[in-house]
Amino acid sequence: MNIDLSGKTALVTGSTQGIGLAIAEGLARSGARVAVNGRTAARVDEAAERVRGLGGTAFGVADDVSTEEGTAQLLAQLPEVDILVNNLGIFGAVPAREITDAQWRIDVEVNGVAAVRLIRACLPCMADRGWRRAIQIASDSALVIPEEMIHYSVSKTALRAVSRGFAKDAAGTGVTVNSVIAGPTHTAGVEDFVYELVDKSLPWEEAQREFMVKYRPQSLLQRLIEPAEIANMVTYLASPLASATTGGALRVDGGYVDSILP
């Protein structure tokens, strides 16, 4: 299977590390020109250089897309986006009854509204030009709700509705809009999260095993997913090979969601 994204410009939000960086690398390997995004210029430049070091074409856009102002600044630098990947997200473990109104608002704003803002801005030009892609990185927590992350789960559930709704809005234009349901994934942020829940003195491999057994026992992989495994699905969805896939929520969850349905 050959995926060729030559001549396409991709924007991956929150792509200085973890899943976002892996997605940027995957798209660049397939020939896309990738805009690496984050809030800190130094980290953005470092990530873009890493992508270029793999032989890809990448440049940095250091703007905070969780805000209206930051989004406007970014879009001024990127008047045309062929592949939009809304990867930006925050998460944290908080006991259900202790999640404050402010924490609810922040998760919904950063994980949900920020994606809506970018899709809304990019979709008109995408529809005018035909073939384009908008992909949202959702989470297994949208389907299997952890009691310590209800606010996060709500925001990621919203992303599934956002993708389905905008896919309907783009019907017949050649633009596809999908979400990817990412399962428990091995990133620096997730390592920190794991150590919030298990003994901090444990070596990482042991801590990971304890976390999976105690907090994610449904996983059929029985390990954390690697970011590149999420990126493989995103690269496919961004390609012409996925031309008939739209309005969907595709799972890369290691069998974590106990369902035979998508």
Report each predicted region and the residues it spans:
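Residue(s) in the substrate-gating loop at a strand-loop-helix junction
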Residues: S139
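Substrate-binding pocket helix/loop in short-chain dehydrogenase/reductase
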Residues: P95-A96, T100-R105, Y215
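Alpha-helical segment proximal to the catalytic Tyr-Lys
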Residues: P124, K168-D169
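Short, small/polar-rich loop/turn modules that mediate ligand/substrate recognition or access, typified
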Residues: A171, T176, T245-G247
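Short C-terminal tail/terminal secondary-structure segment
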Residues: I3-S6, V144, V234-T235, L241, ...
